[in-house]
Amino acid sequence: MIRIAAALCFLAVAFGAFGAHWLKAQLEERHMAEAWHTAVLYHLIHAIALFVLAYFGTTNRGAWWLLFSGIILFSGSLYLMALSGMRWLGPITPIGGLCFLAGWAWLVISPPKL
C-alpha cells in the first residue's frame, strides 16, 4: 500500500508540472486549467493521506480504499475531461468527491491507532 501511495504522490507532482508547462496553452484554450489544478490539488492531498495511513500500518483499509477511489474517480475524471474534452465524464467527478467524504468520515468514526 505504501508503494501505491508513493506512486500516487509522484504522479500528482508530475501531473502538476505537466499541466503547468507542457499543457498550459491547451488547458487554457479549453478553459480547463482550473479543473486540472483542482485535480492535482485533490490528488496530492489524498495521496499524502494514503501514504500516512500506509506508513503507520493502519487497519482502516476501508478508508484507504475510499480515498484511493476518490483519487481515481474525482481527479481521474477531471484529468480526462481536461485532456479529451469528454464532458460526459462530468457526473463521475462528484462520485469521487463522495468517496473522499466517505473516507474521511470513516476516519472520524474509526480513527487509526497510530
Predicted regions span which residues?
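Polytopic transmembrane helical bundles with strong interfacial aromatic enrichment
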Residues: 1-114
